[in-house]
UniProtKB/Swiss-Prot annotation:
Source taxon at top rank: Eukaryota
Protein name listed in UniProt: NFU1 iron-sulfur cluster scaffold homolog, mitochondrial
PANTHER family given in the database record: IRON-SULFUR CLUSTER SCAFFOLD PROTEIN NFU-RELATED, NFU1 IRON-SULFUR CLUSTER SCAFFOLD HOMOLOG, MITOCHONDRIAL
Localization (cell): Mitochondrion
Species annotation: Drosophila erecta
SUPFAM superfamilies: Fe-S cluster assembly (FSCA) domain-like, Hypothetical protein SAV1430
Function: Molecular scaffold for [Fe-S] cluster assembly of mitochondrial iron-sulfur proteins.
Gene Ontology CC annotations of this record: mitochondrion
Transit peptide (first-last residue): 1-30
One Pfam family matching this protein: NifU
Residues the entry annotates as binding [4Fe-4S] cluster: C219, C222
Chain positions covered by the region annotation NifU: 182-250
Length: 283
């Protein structure tokens, strides 16, 4: 997830003001991805031509004869990005489901959490990011996720019951100039890059020179998320906004409590399963 900005890059950005999105992305150094391939399902040369694995299923989706699902690695080894080739939430929209109890607003998220080993689900404009539990195998999870996504989009059901656009970077009447500039940079320059890695970054507040941000999707548990904040996001914000002294990652306490309860529940289930073979027979 690391995104580094050199001094030369910053000088170029200064000369071009905010510059183009492509320019900023190139300076941010989008993390390279390793290809996931599904040899049994590919036409010869498809993976090489597209730079990532393709799975083709003969299933009618939105008037199409076939649905192509691409899988793309993220900088987080426990998160994988699925691109169904159709809009998921539409341009600029994201929605995070850090655990199963938060999936009540999405029929698709509910189905994905039923797949054994799935820990988190994240929806982007045209992708779904799946985060797996530690120790779970992608070779077992991927086929089930493929099936769920294809069946769901074939059904024509809405992804969300009440789809709402991101509001954290919406300019409010009481926002001062510094906050407005922070929101603008996050929304137009930083978030698009983070979303390409299968996650998102949410503005949680600004106080006394400190910008508070929340990482979502593949970024939430990525080992290099702190490096991303300090060497990428913080550098860019400080360059354009001198008032910014530092960037801090914040966590949702409610999510932490739910995650803790889930981990405890899973440990209890594993303990029970391990005890079953040595347990007493039927009475």
């Amino acid at each position: 997830m690391s995104k580094f900005l050199s001094q030369a890059a910053l000088n170029t950005l200064r000369n071009t003001r905010l510059g183009s999105r492509q320019l900023v992305r190139s300076f941010a150094g989008i993390a390279s991805t390793r290809n996931h391939r599904e040899p049994a399902h590919q036409e010869p040369g498809c993976g090489q031509a597209l730079g990532r694995g393709l799975l083709q299923m003969r299933l009618p989706v939105a008037g199409r004869r076939s649905m192509f699902i691409q899988t793309q690695d993220t900088p987080n080894p426990d998160s994988l990005k699925f691109l169904p080739g159709v809009d998921v939430l539409g341009k600029g929209n994201t929605y995070d489901f850090p655990n199963g109890t938060t999936a009540h607003s999405s029929p698709l998220a509910k189905l994905l959490f039923r797949v054994e080993g799935v820990k988190g689900v994240f929806f982007g404009a045209d992708f779904v990011t799946i985060s797996k539990q530690e120790g779970a195998e992608w070779s077992l999870i991927k086929p089930e996720v493929f099936a769920v996504i294809m069946d769901f989009f074939a059904s024509g059901l809405p992804v969300l019951h009440d789809a709402q656009p991101n509001a954290d970077t919406e300019i409010l009447e009481d926002d001062d100039e510094t906050v407005m500039m922070i929101k603008e940079l996050l929304d137009t320059r930083i978030r698009p890059t983070v979303q390409e890695d299968g996650g998102d970054i949410v503005f949680m507040g600004y106080e006394a020179g400190v910008v508070k941000l929340k990482m979502q999707g593949s970024c939430s548990s990525c080992p290099s998320s702190i490096v991303t904040l300090k060497n990428g996001v913080q550098n860019m914000l400080q360059f354009y906004i001198p008032e910014v002294e530092s960037v801090e990652q914040v966590f949702d306490e409610a999510d932490r409590m739910i995650d803790s309860e889930f981990e405890r529940f899973e440990k209890n289930l594993k303990t029970l399963k391990q005890q079953e073979p040595s347990g007493a027979g039927p009475h």
